[in-house]
């Protein structure tokens, strides 16, 4: 057996925990105010109607309603609409 660890083994052993990014509430789901819709780095999704953006670009619901994904001016947006209008 080796008496020294070897060059590479002593430099290994680091890994970071996952950040749990991604969409948390999907289209058509009913949410309450304050619920997190998307955790993201940068603005992959932009806030729309009744949606706010946190300091780390997290999108959250400002009002209760149904989640709606859309595109406006070439940007992916997320809106919160009244649940009654979701008859589709």
UniProtKB/Swiss-Prot annotation:
Entry's transmembrane regions: none
Domain of life: Bacteria
GO molecular-function terms, A-Z: structural constituent of ribosome
GO cellular component: cytosolic large ribosomal subunit
Encoding gene per record: rpmA
Biological processes annotated in GO: translation
Protein name in the entry: Large ribosomal subunit protein bL27
Pfam families in UniProt: Ribosomal_L27
